[in-house]
Amino acid sequence: MDVTNILLKPVLTEKSYLNQMGELKKYVFAINPKATKTKVKLAFEIIYGVKPLKINTLIRKPVTIRNGTKYPGFSKLAKLAVITLPKGMDIAITGEKTTKKETKDQ
C-alpha cells in the first residue's frame, strides 16, 4: 500500500478542533479501511516528519439513511485514526507551516 493511499484526508470538525487546542495535540484523519496502526504511523512520520505518541483507530459503520423514496440508502463505511502528538509538537493541516515549540524540561 502506497503512503499517499493510507492517510486520505484530515477530518475537520468542531470536536477535532477542540482536541487540537489541548496540551497533547490530537488530529483526526480518515484512513484507508485496510490500513493498520503501524502503517498509519509510518505514513504520518513520512508525510509530516513528526513521530506520533499514540494512535487510536475506529470504524464508523454504514447506517441506514432515509432519502424519501421506497428504498433506503446507506452512509459510507469510514475508518478514522486519532493521532496524538508528543507534548510541544504541532503540525500544519490547513496550509500553515509546521512548527516545533521548545519546552523547558524541569
Curated annotation (Swiss-Prot):
One Pfam family matching this protein: Ribosomal_L23
Gene3D superfamilies xrefs: 3.30.70.330
Matching InterPro entries: Nucleotide-bd_a/b_plait_sf (IPR012677), Ribosomal_uL23-like (IPR013025), Ribosomal_uL23/eL15/eS24_sf (IPR012678)
Keywords (A to Z) from UniProt: Ribonucleoprotein, Ribosomal protein, RNA-binding, rRNA-binding
Amino-acid biosynthesis recorded as keyword: no
Function: One of the early assembly proteins it binds 23S rRNA. One of the proteins that surrounds the polypeptide exit tunnel on the outside of the ribosome. Forms the main docking site for trigger factor binding to the ribosome.
Name of the protein: Large ribosomal subunit protein uL23
Protein's organism: Mycoplasma genitalium (strain ATCC 33530 / DSM 19775 / NCTC 10195 / G37)
Lineage, broadest ranks: Bacteria, Bacillati, Mycoplasmatota, Mycoplasmoidales, Mycoplasmoidaceae
